[in-house]
C-alpha cells in the first residue's frame, strides 16, 4: 500500500443527474401518403420514419396536395410550410402491394422525346410501354420520372427502340388510397409473422429513435369514432411507462353547426383527458386541412419556442390559416361568443381576432372532469412530459443499490430541477421520499416510491376588469381640485 505524504485530490461521479431532454411536442402522425413518389415505395409502409425537413419527408413517403386521399401530407405541409417545426414522425399505412388498382390502357403523345401519362398514383415499376407494337425496356429505351403534379413522365432515349415514336401505349398499376380503411389506421398484430401495423407502431418510436411521443395525430381519420377512441387509448402506457396526448377532429360532415358539436362529442365518446378535440376544418388559401394537422404543428411550435417545455397553452396563438370550413368547403364564421360556447363543452376552435388564432384550453374530458391537471390542455401535457422526463433521467438508477445515497440523489436532483423551472415555467415542483409510503415489505421487494408535487400555471382564461363611474373625480375636475 502506498505511503501518502502531502495534499491529494480525488474526483467522484456527480450525484446530481443531468436531466435527459426529449422533444416535448414530438408529433407521431398516422395516415396515408403517395408512396409511389417516394424514393422506395415498397419500404415506406408501416415503418415509423423521422423527418427534419420537407424534402426529407417527401423522399421518404412522397407528397401531394390531395389532402383528402393522402392525409399525412396535411401534417407535412402544416409543419414544414405553415409553421416550420421539426422533427415529425410519419407512419404511412398505404401499402402499394395491397392498396392498388390496374389502370386503363393509355395512349399518349410524344413531344420532344417525352410523354406524360396523366394518371395519378402510378407505380413506376409496373409500367409497360409500347411503341409501334414493340415493347420498350425501362432503363434502355426510356426512363421514368414524375412531374410536380405527380404524373408519370416517360423520356425516350436517343438510341432506344422508341426514339422515333409519335405515340406510346402505356399500361400501369396505381396505388389506391380509397382502399385504405379505418382498420389499416388502427392496425394490429399478426401472430403468425409478428408484424405490427398502424397504431401498434407507436411503441416503436422510443426504441428506434430514443424520443418519446408527445402528440398523436391521424388527420383525416380521427373524426371516425373507431379511430379517435383507439388513438386516445394509445396515449397511456406507451412501452408500458410513457404518456402523451392526442389531437382529434369532430366530423364536420355530421356536425355542420357549432351547436351540433357537443351532441356529436358525447354520442361518439370523445371524452378522454388526453385528447384535444377540435372543430371545424381550416383553410390556407385553397388548401383545406383537418384542424388537427395545423393545431398539432402549432402546439409543437409553441413548445419549441419555449425551451421545449410544454407549460404554455397553444390557445390565442396565430396559426397562419385564412379561414374555417366544413368538409364540403362551406365557410364557417364564428365569433368569440360562439367559440366560447364550444370551449365550455371541451372543444377547441379558432377565431379571427386581428388574425386567425387558436381558441380554447380545455381537453375533451371537460366539463365532466374539472381536475386542473386533466382539464387544462397545457397542464395535462406538463404532467405527461414531466413524468416521461423523470423516467428517462432516472432509468440509469434502476438496479443500483436501493440505499440512502440513491434516494438522496433522486430527491436532490429532482428538487434542483424543479427549482430551475420556477417561476418561469411553473409555480413549483418538489419531490419527497416518505417512509409511510415505503413500508419495509416493499423495500425488501426492491420497490422504492417517491411523491412529487407539481404546480404548472393554469391559463389566464377569463380576465375581468370592473369599470365604475367615479363622480368624485368629475366633481374634482370641474371644481379645479378645490
Residue ranges and their predicted role:
Residues 2-21, 27-45, 49-52, 68-96, ...:
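A glycine- and small-residue-enriched flexible loop/hinge signal that marks low-structured segments
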Residues 84-146, 175-177:
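Extended beta-strand solenoid/passenger and fiber regions
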Residues 127-185:
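Surface-exposed interaction regions enriched in Ser/Thr/Asp/Glu
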Residues 107-112, 140-153, 252-254, 270, ...:
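Short, ordered beta-strand-loop transition motifs
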Residues 88, 99-102, 171-190, 426-482:
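Compositionally biased, low-complexity/repeat regions
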Residues 376-436:
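Acidic, low-complexity glycine/serine/threonine-rich segments
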Residues 114-119, 149-159, 348-351, 355-366, ...:
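Generic recognition of long tandem-repeat/solenoid scaffolds
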Amino acid at each position: 500500500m502506498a505511503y501518502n505524504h502531502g495534499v491529494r485530490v480525488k474526483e467522484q461521479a456527480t450525484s446530481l443527474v443531468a436531466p435527459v431532454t426529449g422533444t416535448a411536442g414530438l408529433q407521431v402522425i398516422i395516415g396515408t401518403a403517395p408512396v409511389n413518389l417516394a424514393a422506395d415505395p415498397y419500404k415506406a409502409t408501416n415503418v415509423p420514419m423521422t423527418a427534419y425537413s420537407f424534402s426529407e419527408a417527401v423522399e421518404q413517403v412522397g407528397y401531394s396536395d390531395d389532402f383528402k386521399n393522402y392525409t399525412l401530407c396535411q401534417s407535412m405541409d402544416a409543419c414544414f410550410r405553415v409553421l416550420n417545426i421539426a422533427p415529425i414522425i410519419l407512419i404511412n399505412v398505404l401499402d402499394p402491394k395491397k392498396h392498388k388498382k390496374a389502370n386503363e390502357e393509355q395512349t399518349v403523345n410524344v413531344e420532344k422525346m417525352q410523354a406524360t401519362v396523366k394518371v395519378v398514383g402510378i407505380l413506376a415499376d409496373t409500367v409497360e410501354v409500347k411503341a409501334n407494337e414493340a415493347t420498350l425496356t425501362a432503363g434502355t429505351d426510356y426512363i421514368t420520372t414524375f412531374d410536380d403534379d405527380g404524373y408519370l413522365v416517360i423520356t425516350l432515349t436517343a438510341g432506344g427502340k422508341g426514339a422515333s415514336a409519335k405515340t406510346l401505349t402505356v399500361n400501369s398499376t396505381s396505388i389506391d388510397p380509397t382502399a385504405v380503411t379505418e382498420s389499416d389506421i388502427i392496425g394490429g398484430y399478426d401472430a403468425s409473422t409478428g408484424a405490427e401495423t398502424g397504431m401498434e407502431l407507436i411503441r416503436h418510436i422510443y426504441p428506434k429513435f430514443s424520443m418519446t411521443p408527445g402528440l398523436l395525430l391521424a388527420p383525416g381519420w380521427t373524426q371516425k369514432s373507431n379511430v379517435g377512441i383507439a388513438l386516445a387509448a394509445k396515449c397511456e402506457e406507451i412501452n408500458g411507462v410513457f404518456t402523451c396526448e392526442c389531437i382529434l377532429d369532430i366530423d364536420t360532415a355530421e356536425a355542420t353547426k357549432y351547436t351540433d358539436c357537443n351532441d356529436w362529442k358525447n354520442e361518439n365518446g370523445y371524452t378522454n383527458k388526453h385528447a384535444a378535440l377540435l372543430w371545424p376544418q381550416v383553410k390556407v388559401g385553397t388548401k383545406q386541412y383537418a384542424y388537427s394537422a395545423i393545431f398539432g404543428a402549432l402546439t409543437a411550435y409553441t413548445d419549441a419556442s419555449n425551451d421545449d417545455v410544454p407549460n404554455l397553452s397553444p390557445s390565442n396563438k396565430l396559426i397562419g390559416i385564412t379561414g374555417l370550413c366544413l368538409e364540403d368547403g362551406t365557410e364557417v364564421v364564428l365569433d368569440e361568443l360562439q367559440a366560447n360556447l364550444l370551449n365550455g363543452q371541451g372543444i377547441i376552435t379558432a377565431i379571427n381576432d386581428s388574425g386567425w388564432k387558436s381558441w380554447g384550453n380545455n381537453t375533451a374530458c371537460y366539463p365532466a372532469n374539472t381536475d386542473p391537471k386533466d382539464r387544462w390542455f397545457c397542464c395535462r401535457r406538463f404532467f405527461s412530459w414531466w413524468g416521461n422526463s423523470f423516467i428517462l433521467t432516472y432509468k440509469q438508477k434502476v438496479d443500483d443499490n436501493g440505499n440512502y445515497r440513491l434516494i438522496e440523489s433522486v430527491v436532490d436532483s429532482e428538487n434542483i430541477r424543479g427549482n430551475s423551472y420556477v417561476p418561469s415555467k411553473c409555480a413549483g415542483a418538489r419531490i419527497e421520499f416518505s417512509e409511510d409510503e415505503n413500508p419495509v415489505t416493499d423495500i425488501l421487494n426492491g420497490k422504492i416510491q417517491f411523491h412529487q408535487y407539481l404546480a404548472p400555471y393554469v391559463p389566464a382564461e377569463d380576465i375581468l376588469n370592473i369599470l365604475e363611474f367615479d363622480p368624485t373625480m368629475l366633481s374634482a375636475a370641474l371644481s379645479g381640485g378645490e
